[in-house]
């Protein structure tokens, strides 16, 4: 299957992924690729009008990569992932959503 969109990882995401153990990193990358071809809220979920999250559960740990749609290029659909966290609470921290919105404005 062809990907529905391209994913661009910013430096903060790469640093986050490099800080994880290999199995967790592999699972997140697998889920990123899978989210490009299937429509599944368990993998890629809208948080508000502008912010989305890539979701991964590995060994009872919830990982989130925050992202937004880049609509500047009319020929290609791109999702830009801004940063990642290990989610420790039920609700997504507002500061993480705000961080994504700030990066989006740059």
PLM features: what roles do these ranges have?
Residues 1-62, 71-79, 86-106:
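Basic, Lys/Arg-enriched alpha-helical interface segments
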